[in-house]
């Protein structure tokens, strides 16, 4: 006879916890803010370096690309950071894997791409993921 009140109490508690969790799940996906930020801001700077490294890893080009102009950086805050990055990248004189003293290629070897990246970022754990990438050549 005593088991029935405890079972009813456990069921009531489970329902209550479920009802409390639902608004949290809905709220978790809400944007807290979207702002344009400076490229020199720590986490934006880390994200820019990370996309440069990723772009070069995925590229079949023999020369390294480097960001030469940051056109726009937006930071979106939810339960993580998301950066929307518009950049101008150019081929450098450095062939892979060399990365020091790299300057832009000139004349016939000049190659430039304009790219937009959306990056999922949890920089305090050094976790990044490209959500969207779109690049076009000059």
UniProtKB/Swiss-Prot annotation:
Glycosylation sites: 132
Keyword Signal: yes
Subcellular locations according to the entry: Secreted
Gene3D superfamilies attached to this UniProt entry: 3.10.450.10
Coiled-coil segments on the chain, per record: none
Disulfide bonds: 94-102, 115-135
GO molecular function, one term: cysteine-type endopeptidase inhibitor activity
Leader sequence segment: 1-26
Keywords: Antibiotic, Antimicrobial, Disulfide bond, Glycoprotein, Protease inhibitor, Secreted, Signal, Thiol protease inhibitor
GO cellular component: cytoplasm; extracellular region; nucleus; sperm flagellum; sperm head
Keyword Kinase belongs to the record: no
UniProt similarity note: Belongs to the cystatin family.
Protein name per its UniProtKB record: Cystatin-11
Species for this entry: Homo sapiens
């Amino acid at each position: 006879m005593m088991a029935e009140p405890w079972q009813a109490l456990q069921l009531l508690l489970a329902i209550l916890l479920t009802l409390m969790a639902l608004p949290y799940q809905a709220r978790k996906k809400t944007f807290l803010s979207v702002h344009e930020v400076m490229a020199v801001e720590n986490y934006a700077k880390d994200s820019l370096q990370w996309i440069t490294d990723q772009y070069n890893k995925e590229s079949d080009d023999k020369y390294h690309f480097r960001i030469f102009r940051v056109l726009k950086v937006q930071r979106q805050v939810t339960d993580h950071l998301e950066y929307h990055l518009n950049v101008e990248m150019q081929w450098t004189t450095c062939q892979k894997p060399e990365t020091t003293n790299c300057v832009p290629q000139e004349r016939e070897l000049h190659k430039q791409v304009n790219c937009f990246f959306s990056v999922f970022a949890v920089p305090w754990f050094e976790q990044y993921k490209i959500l969207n990438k779109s690049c076009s050549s000059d």
